[in-house]
């Protein structure tokens, strides 16, 4: 039976992750080519930002920043799409999480701030934590001429990491080079029972980093 590392070794490993995290750099907008870039917003909807069982102050805190970044993208002709939880009453996900973001309710709608930042956002509904598994999303990305993807939103250790890793893996599978960028300041996780948000978020970012995702502090 394999045993977990002893505490001192774990703390040594964690120190390395912490130092990496605190050394994150800021990406300059000039380093992004607008015509080949797609901004993907994950779950910045009322049910995670403003109301409902899974709304949280952590996600609310990035709402305006993502709205501002979305407006910046529009000004640079960078296309933005959004993924939004749209569950049915019999969603099996409710065996893990409280009932949330039912299709057709205000919880599944983008926040007003983000909707107002760009009136041309295409919204894709999703019924799981991995939006890339929705056929319409994967097909849209595959048929686009984009090879740089900036992912913002929530939750970093759930929907964001799953989407980012699956996107990267799909491009790798097809031998198509791509750049996947996740800005820390434009992502957040939430507080749930038996969930340590700061640790979960940091480790999610580190796992993405070790799998070829570009983690930056912000894009300024």
Model-derived features with residue positions:
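Short coil/turn segments at secondary-structure boundaries
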Residues: 53-60, 97-102, 128
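Short acidic, Gly/Ser-rich segments with clustered Asp/Glu that frequently serve as metal-coordination loops
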Residues: 44-52
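A basic- and aromatic-enriched beta-loop-alpha substructure that forms the phosphate/nucleotide-
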Residues: 82-103
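Solvent-exposed loop/turn segments at secondary-structure junctions
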Residues: 47, 87-90, 156-157
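Short, conserved acidic/polar surface loops in the N-terminal third of protein domains
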Residues: 51-52, 91-96, 134-136
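Active-site metal-binding loops of divalent metal-dependent hydrolases
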Residues: 43-44, 85-86, 154, 186
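A short alpha/beta connector and helix-capping loop motif
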Residues: 35, 39, 52-85
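Active-site-adjacent betaalpha module
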Residues: 1-38, 99-220
């Amino acid at each position: 039976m394999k045993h977990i590392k002893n505490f001192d070794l774990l703390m040594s490993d964690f120190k390395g992750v912490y130092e990496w995290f605190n050394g994150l750099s800021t990406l300059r907008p000039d380093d992004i080519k607008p015509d080949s870039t797609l901004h993907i917003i994950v779950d910045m909807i009322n049910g995670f930002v403003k109301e409902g069982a899974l709304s949280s102050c952590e996600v609310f805190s990035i709402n305006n920043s993502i709205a501002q970044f979305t407006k910046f993208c529009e000004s640079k002709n960078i296309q933005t799409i959004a993924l939004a939880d749209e569950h049915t009453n019999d969603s099996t996900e409710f065996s893990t999480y409280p009932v949330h973001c039912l299709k057709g309710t205000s919880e599944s709608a983008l926040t007003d701030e983000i909707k107002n930042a760009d009136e041309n956002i295409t919204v894709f509904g999703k019924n799981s934590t991995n939006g890339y598994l929705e056929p319409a999303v994967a097909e849209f990305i595959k048929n686009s001429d984009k090879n740089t993807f900036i992912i913002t939103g929530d939750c970093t250790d759930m929907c964001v990491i799953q989407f980012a890793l699956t996107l990267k893996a799909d491009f790798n599978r097809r031998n198509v080079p791509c750049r996947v960028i996740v800005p820390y300041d434009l992502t957040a996780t939430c507080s749930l029972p038996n969930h340590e948000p700061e640790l979960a978020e940091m480790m999610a970012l580190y796992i993405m980093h070790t799998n070829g995702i570009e983690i930056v502090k912000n894009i300024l």
